[in-house]
């Protein structure tokens, strides 16, 4: 595979968080903003157009994992939401906080109403296919961690 053929948010957003969690200079903060913008421009979907049956095929807002895997993944949502929250904490950027909150709130929208599990992918499925949905432990951990972080930041339980 040639370089840049399969971009992913899984490096840019976490690296922005890494920079912002140190003692970033103003130049490093701007570099982090650029990394977050890259993640948003390439992978964040704030809305989805309905299909021919007037159904939106994915729960939005969400974050796709990579170019070759055009599926919204909870861990990717958490990567970008964490970067937004880190930017908010470093700069007070209220738009970054609002974007993080929108992404994190959607985790509770896709959550299974019976058992509380958050699926690894946010694609809408028919009931039979939905029974075979996967729940990756690393993704579940990321979802729980970001929900707890948001609860702490907002004072909500």
Show which residues each predicted segment covers:
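Glycan-recognition and catalytic cores of secretory/periplasmic carbohydrate-active enzymes
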Residues: 1-157
């Amino acid at each position: 595979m040639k370089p840049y053929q399969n971009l992913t948010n899984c490096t840019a957003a976490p690296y922005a968080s890494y920079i912002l969690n140190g003692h970033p200079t103003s130049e490093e903060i701007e570099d982090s903003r650029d990394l977050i913008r890259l993640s948003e421009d390439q992978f964040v979907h704030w809305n989805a157009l309905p299909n021919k049956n007037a159904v939106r095929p994915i729960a939005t807002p969400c974050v796709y994992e990579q170019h070759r895997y055009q599926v919204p993944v909870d861990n990717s949502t958490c990567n970008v939401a964490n970067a937004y929250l880190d930017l908010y904490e470093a700069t007070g950027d209220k738009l970054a906080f609002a974007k993080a909150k929108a992404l994190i709130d959607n985790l509770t929208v896709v959550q299974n109403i019976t058992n509380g599990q958050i699926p690894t992918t946010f694609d809408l499925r028919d009931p039979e296919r939905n029974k075979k949905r996967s729940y990756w432990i690393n993704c579940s951990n990321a979802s729980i961690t970001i929900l707890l972080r948001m609860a702490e930041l907002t004072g909500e339980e």
